[in-house]
């Protein structure tokens, strides 16, 4: 599980920091060597933060000169609604020094984050839209409020989006890229999820505006710090465009437990962005995955066409709602379509319905609770302690 946060918070809280325990108890094979995320305590000022960064830079330079370390030091700083953190590439001596600073809340190892999609099935039926707009299964028509997310901005934090795809014509722009220098979707995952949350044909919120935020490579992987950097950008962008309270964010990705990842999405939600997250595809308790385990966000598990839990879907008390995730047809780069399965496909259904609710006047703070309230209690064998509620858009059908 690799839950470093518990260890690092404890280490940061005691007077004599046993940094050896931190390095020894890394856990998992997803740790990025010598890469860390440092989170400051609440209340640390901008001046204190800058002073800390300067001190870390000096310490890193000194240690690098002494030991010939090839680490590069501080990389990016984050400020998500007052949550201050940074990531970097440091040797152990520098991390030991960082852990001793009383302004530091915790340090955790940066880890690999991957998309949450599984298989492709050619010519599978398009069933998700009909299912989320009817109380009974088997309906092919999608019934929805005509506002359809109009006036809402949805950030697709993923592998990028094919912004030239006709599904998004006139409603999409490229945002930022935290993983490479290729501002395209070389994987297809991000285009597919965007097609579900806001595509003209395959989407739920058909009139919402879309922003492509690339945090995963064409191979479908990235880092926790790269995802946090993308989320930070989204909050800053929404604030600059007066879109807080009128924005949603889809995260069809995840990794092992990360308190920093959970903190970042929580602050984004608190800032005024509805956040939908994939529960994960390991058929295990989602409490062990991030950012799915963040209580503040709307965590989506995956259902099948016959209202059962998808065999791969994570479950648990942290799951807020089930949504269609098996064999979902949506957009593919180059103007085509593709069928994918995964909680990655469930999350954008939730994101789209959430965005549509925001357009109807439901607040960001109330949106997930509203989805849980009106969801249909139809999922069979949802998993131990897991809701049996299936996503419903309240169409009345």
Curated annotation (Swiss-Prot):
Q: Name one Pfam family in it.
A: Peptidase_S8
Which residues make up the pro-peptide? 20-116
Q: So where's the catalytic machinery, residue-wise?
A: 158 (charge relay system), 189 (charge relay system), 344 (charge relay system)
Its induction note reads: Expression is up-regulated during infection.
Gene Ontology terms, MF aspect: serine-type endopeptidase activity
Q: Does the keyword Cell cycle apply?
A: no
- The main location class comes to secreted
- Domain Inhibitor I9, which positions? 35-116
**For the Peptidase S8 domain, which residue ranges apply?**
126-397
One GO cellular-component annotation of the UniProt record comes to:
extracellular region
Top enzyme class, one word, equals hydrolase
Enzyme Commission number(s) of this protein: 3.4.21.-
Residues that carry a glycan: 250, 393
Q: What does the UniProt entry say about where the protein is found?
A: Secreted
Taxonomic superkingdom? Eukaryota
What the entry lists under InterPro entries is as follows:
PCSK9_ProteinaseK-like, Peptidase_S8/S53_dom, Peptidase_S8/S53_dom_sf, Peptidase_S8_Ser-AS, Peptidase_S8_subtilisin-like, Peptidase_S8_subtilisin-rel, S8pro/Inhibitor_I9, S8pro/Inhibitor_I9_sf
Extract the coiled-coil ranges from the record.
none
* UniProt entry keywords in alphabetical sequence: Glycoprotein, Hydrolase, Protease, Secreted, Serine protease, Signal, Virulence, Zymogen
Q: Which GO terms describe its biological process?
A: proteolysis
SUPFAM superfamilies recorded:
Protease propeptides/inhibitors (SSF54897), Subtilisin-like (SSF52743)
Q: Where is the signal peptide?
A: 1-19
Instruction: Describe the task this protein carries out.
Output: Secreted subtilisin-like serine protease with keratinolytic activity that contributes to pathogenicity.
The family assignment reads: Belongs to the peptidase S8 family.
Q: What is this protein called?
A: Subtilisin-like protease 3
Q: Which organism is it from?
A: Arthroderma benhamiae (strain ATCC MYA-4681 / CBS 112371)
């Amino acid at each position: 599980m690799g839950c470093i946060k518990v260890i690092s918070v404890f280490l940061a809280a005691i007077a004599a920091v046993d940094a050896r325990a931190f390095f020894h108890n890394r856990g998992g094979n997803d740790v990025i060597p010598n890469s860390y995320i440092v989170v400051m305590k609440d209340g640390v000022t901008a001046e204190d933060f800058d002073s800390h960064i300067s001190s870390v830079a000096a310490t890193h330079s000194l240690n690098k000169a002494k030991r010939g370390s090839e680490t590069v030091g501080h990389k990016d700083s984050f400020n998500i609604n007052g949550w201050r953190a940074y990531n970097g590439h440091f040797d152990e001596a520098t991390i030991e020094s960082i852990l001793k600073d009383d302004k530091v809340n915790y340090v955790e190892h940066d880890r690999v984050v991957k998309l949450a999609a599984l298989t492709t099935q050619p010519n599978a039926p398009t069933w998700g839209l009909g299912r989320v707009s009817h109380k009974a299964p088997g309906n092919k028509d999608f019934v929805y409020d005509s506002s359809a997310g109009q006036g809402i901005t949805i950030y697709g934090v993923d592998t990028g989006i094919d912004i030239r795809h006709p599904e998004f014509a006139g409603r999409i722009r490229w945002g930022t890229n935290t993983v490479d220098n290729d501002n395209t979707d070389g994987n297809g995952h991000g285009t597919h999820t965007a097609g579900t949350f806001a595509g003209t044909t395959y989407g739920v919120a058909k009139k919402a505006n879309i922003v492509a935020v690339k945090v995963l490579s064409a191979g479908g992987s990235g880092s926790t710090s790269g995802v946090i950097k993308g989320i930070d950008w989204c909050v800053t962008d929404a604030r600059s465009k007066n879109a807080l309270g009128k924005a949603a964010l889809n995260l069809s990705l995840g990794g092992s437990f990360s308190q920093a990842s959970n903190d970042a999405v929580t602050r984004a939600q608190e800032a005024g962005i509805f956040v939908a997250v994939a529960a994960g595809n390991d058929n295990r308790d989602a409490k062990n995955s991030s950012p799915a385990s963040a209580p503040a966000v709307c965590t989506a598990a995956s259902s099948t066409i016959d209202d059962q839990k998808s065999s791969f879907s994570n479950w648990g008390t942290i799951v807020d709602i089930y949504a269609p995730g098996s064999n979902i047809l949506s957009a593919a780069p180059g103007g085509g379509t593709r069928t994918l399965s995964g909680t990655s496909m469930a999350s954008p259904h939730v994101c789209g319905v959430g965005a549509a609710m925001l357009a109807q006047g439901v607040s960001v703070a109330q949106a997930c609770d509203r989805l849980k309230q009106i969801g249909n209690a139809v999922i069979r064998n949802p998993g131990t302690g897991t809701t049996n509620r299936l996503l419903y858009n309240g169409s009345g059908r």
